[in-house]
UniProtKB/Swiss-Prot annotation:
One of its GO terms (cellular component) is membrane. This is Anthrax toxin receptor-like. Residues 76-247 form the VWFA domain. Residues 28-363 are extracellular.
Length: 641
C-alpha cells in the first residue's frame, strides 16, 4: 500500500485563486458599503494618480545626455543670460538654450522671467505665467545683438528685485535662478556677483550656474554654492543644448506624490513625500513639512529622513473623520514652499474589536494572486516529487478462530432431604420437599444442555460416602456397604479425571467422617464410561426409593435391579461394584451399572456434572444388606439417560 504526506489539495488552491482574481483586477468589482467603503473607492483613484506621477519621476531621473520629461513643478524661474561682446556670433546658441529650457517647464502655474546682462542688465520678460507673453519675449530675445562687458552681478540684482517683490506680495513659492556666462569674471564683478547670489539664497532662491567657452569652474561653483549645481560646457556654444535636460532635471523642484493619502483618525502616522530636486537645500534643518487643517490650524514638522527624491516626515493626529489636510514642503526654512496642495484625508479605521486602526492599501491585493499561484505550484510540485511511502501489508486474518473452551457444567441439584438429617453439598435448583409436607413442588424447568466438551474429557463425580477404609485412585472401591453405610454421614463421590485416555477412573471421598465399616469384598473399576456393573444376585431385584416417603419396596423380577432417587438430568456413571440402576422419579433419568459381561456396546455419556446424592439412613441400610445378599452381578439391559 502507498500513501502520500498530507497536503492541501491543488484543486482547492486553484478554486480560491479563481474566486479572488476578479475582485483584484477588476476596478469596479471592489464594492464595500461598510464604515470604510470610501477608503477603497479613493484608494483606486489615489493609486492611479500615484502610479502616473511615479512614472514621470522615473522619466525625469535619467543620466546626462538622455532625453528627460517635462517639469511639472510650480515655482518661479529666472533665466539670466550673458549678452556681452565675447559671445559675438554665438548668440543663436544661447537663444536656443533659453528656448529649450522654457519649453521644458510646462506647468501653467509656473512663472518665468528672462533677464540679459552685459555692462548693464535688462529685463526682457517680467515674472509671469502667461504663455503669450513668454512667446513674445522669446522673439525679442532672438533678435538681440551681443555687446558690452560681463557684469553678472547686475543680472542677479534684477532677479533679486523681483523675488523680493513677489515675497512682499504674499506669494510664497520656491525661486530658481539659472545664470549663464561665456567667460572669466573680473575680480570686482566676481565679488559683487558672489554677494548677490548670497542675497538670493537668503530669500530662498536656488542658484544654478552654466559656463561655456572661457569660464572658470571655481568661480561658478562659488556662485552656485554647491558643486552639484554647476554645469560646464567645454565643447563650445553648440553643445549648450546638451545640458538642457540634466539642468531641467536638477532645477525642477517638485512634489510628485505623498503616501499615504488616507490615514486613521486620532492616530499617529508618517508621510513619505516623493519628488524631484528635493536636495536643493544646504541643510536638512531648513526643510519643513507643513500641514494645514481645514480650521486654519498649521502644524510644522521636521523631516526624519530625506534624499534627492524623497522626504519622510511624521504626521500630526487628525481628530475628525473625513477631514482633509493639505501638505506643503519648504526647502529654505519656510521662506517658500513647493507642492500643489497635496491632500491627506482621515478615515475611520477603528472597529469595535480592534484597539488600533489599520490603513488598507489596494496594492496589497495585487500580491495575493501571486502568493496563491506560488502555493499552487509548490503543492503540485510536492505531489509530483514526493515518493510514496509503502505501508506494511495488514496481518492476514485467521481462517478459523479458536473455539473458546466452555466452562464445566454446573453441579446438579441435590436430592430432597429424607426423614434423616443430612446436609446437601453443592448448589441445586431448589430445596426438596420436607418430610411430612404436602405434595412435592413442581420441578424447575431444566436448563439447556451445555456445549459438549472434547471426547477425552473425563469429569469428576462426587458420591456420598463415609470413611470406610482405604480407597485407591485406580479403581479400588469397597462394596455397597462401604458407600452407603448407615453409620456414615453422606459424603460426595468424586469422579476424577484420568491422567491418560484409557486409564481407570478415580474416586475421591470428600472428608470421611466415620470409621470404616466391615465390608466383605472389593471391586475393581473398569474403563467403561457408560455404566458400571455390580455383582448381581441370581435373581433380579428392584429397589425404588421415594425421596419424600419413608418406605421402599424390593421386588424381584427378571430385570436388573434399579435404585430410584432424585438427581439432575445428566447421567452419572458410578463404580462397577454397584449392581443396580438408579433413577429419579421426577425426570425418570437412570444411572445404569453394567457388568463386564454386558453384550451392549459401551457408549460415552454426556459430560457429567457433579452429583451430590444424600440418602436417608434406611436407604443406606437397604443398599448395604443388598450388597451382602447378592454377590453375583446381574446383566444390565443397557444404559438409560
Amino acid at each position: 500500500m502507498m500513501s502520500h504526506s498530507p497536503s492541501m489539495p491543488c484543486s482547492a488552491l486553484f478554486l480560491l485563486l479563481l474566486l479572488l482574481l476578479p475582485p483584484t483586477f477588476k476596478g469596479g468589482s471592489l464594492r464595500y458599503h461598510g464604515p470604510g467603503w470610501k477608503l477603497f473607492h479613493r484608494l483606486s483613484k489615489g493609486f492611479r494618480s500615484s502610479h502616473q506621477r511615479q512614472t514621470q519621476q522615473m522619466r525625469q531621473n535619467v543620466p546626462q545626455g538622455q532625453s528627460g520629461d517635462d517639469c511639472q513643478g510650480i515655482f518661479d524661474l529666472y533665466l539670466v543670460l550673458d549678452k556681452s561682446g565675447s559671445v559675438a556670433d554665438n548668440w543663436i546658441h544661447i537663444y536656443s538654450f533659453a528656448e529649450g529650457l522654457v519649453k521644458k517647464f510646462t506647468n501653467p502655474n509656473l512663472r518665468i522671467s528672462i533677464i540679459t546682462y552685459s555692462t548693464e542688465a535688462e529685463v526682457i520678460l517680467p515674472l509671469t505665467s502667461d504663455s503669450k507673453e513668454i512667446n513674445k519675449s522669446l522673439l525679442v530675445l532672438k533678435n538681440i545683438v551681443p555687446q558690452g562687458l560681463t557684469h553678472m552681478q547686475k543680472g542677479l540684482r534684477k532677479a533679486n528685485e523681483q523675488i523680493r517683490k513677489s515675497t512682499l506680495g504674499g506669494r510664497i513659492v520656491n525661486s530658481v535662478i539659472i545664470a549663464l556666462t561665456d567667460g572669466l569674471l573680473l575680480l570686482k564683478p566676481y565679488l559683487d556677483t558672489m554677494e548677490e547670489a548670497k542675497k538670493a539664497r537668503r530669500m530662498g532662491a536656488i542658484v544654478y550656474t552654466v559656463g561655456v567657452f572661457m569660464y572658470s569652474k571655481q568661480q561658478l561653483v562659488n556662485i552656485a554654492g554647491d558643486p552639484d549645481r554647476c554645469f560646464g560646457v567645454d565643447e563650445g556654444f553648440s553643445a549648450l543644448e546638451g545640458v538642457v535636460d540634466p539642468l531641467t532635471s536638477k532645477s525642477c523642484t517638485e512634489i510628485l506624490s505623498v503616501q499615504p493619502t488616507y490615514v486613521c483618525a486620532k492616530d499617529f502616522y508618517q508621510v513619505n513625500i516623493s519628488g524631484h530636486g528635493l536636495n536643493n537645500t544646504s541643510n536638512m534643518k531648513q526643510v519643513i513639512c507643513r500641514f494645514k487643517f481645514s480650521d486654519s490650524k498649521v502644524v510644522d514638522e521636521s523631516p526624519s529622513d530625506m534624499n534627492e527624491h524623497s522626504i519622510t516626515c511624521p504626521g500630526p493626529k487628525i481628530k475628525h473623520t473625513g477631514e482633509d489636510v493639505s501638505l506643503q514642503v519648504s526647502l529654505n526654512n519656510g521662506i517658500s514652499f513647493i507642492g500643489n496642495k497635496l491632500i491627506i484625508t482621515s478615515t475611520n479605521c477603528w472597529s469595535p474589536r480592534a484597539s488600533q486602526g489599520i490603513v488598507f492599501k489596494r496594492t496589497w491585493l495585487m500580491f495575493l494572486p501571486v502568493l496563491l499561484v506560488t502555493l499552487l505550484l509548490l503543492c503540485c510540485t510536492w505531489k509530483l516529487c514526493i515518493k510514496p511511502k509503502k505501508l506494511p501489508p495488514p496481518p492476514p486474518k485467521p481462517e478459523k478462530e479458536p473455539e473458546e473452551e466452555s466452562p464445566p457444567p454446573s453441579s446438579p441439584p441435590a436430592p430432597g432431604r429424607g426423614p434423616g438429617p443430612g446436609p446437601s453439598a453443592g448448589p441445586g435448583p431448589g430445596p426438596g420437599p420436607s418430610p411430612g409436607s404436602g405434595p412435592a413442588r413442581s420441578p424447575v424447568p431444566a436448563r439447556p444442555p451445555p456445549a459438549p466438551l472434547p471426547a477425552n474429557t473425563n469429569p469428576t463425580v462426587i458420591v456420598a460416602c463415609c470413611g470406610c477404609g482405604n480407597r485407591g485412585m485406580q479403581g479400588n472401591l469397597d462394596t455397597c456397604c462401604d458407600y452407603f453405610h448407615p453409620s456414615c454421614h453422606p459424603m460426595p463421590l468424586v469422579w476424577c479425571h484420568p491422567k491418560a485416555q484409557g486409564g481407570y477412573p478415580g474416586f475421591a471421598v470428600m472428608k470421611p467422617s466415620c470409621s470404616q465399616a466391615s465390608c466383605r469384598q472389593k471391586h475393581c473399576l473398569c474403563s467403561n464410561r457408560d455404566c458400571f456393573h455390580l455383582a448381581e444376585p441370581p435373581y433380579p431385584t428392584r429397589i425404588v426409593f421415594q425421596p419424600n416417603e419413608k418406605y421402599f419396596s424390593i421386588t424381584q423380577s427378571h430385570y436388573s435391579p434399579k435404585i430410584r432417587f432424585q438427581t439432575n438430568q445428566e447421567s452419572l456413571p458410578v463404580a462397577q461394584t454397584l449392581c443396580s440402576k438408579m433413577c429419579s422419579p421426577p425426570n425418570q433419568e437412570c444411572y445404569t451399572f453394567k457388568s463386564p459381561q454386558s453384550p451392549y456396546q459401551a457408549r460415552y455419556t454426556k459430560s457429567p456434572a457433579r452429583m451430590l446424592p444424600l440418602l436417608p439412613p434406611h436407604t443406606r441400610q437397604s443398599l448395604e444388606s443388598l450388597c451382602h445378599t447378592y454377590p453375583f452381578p446381574p446383566i444390565s439391559k443397557g444404559p438409560k439417560f
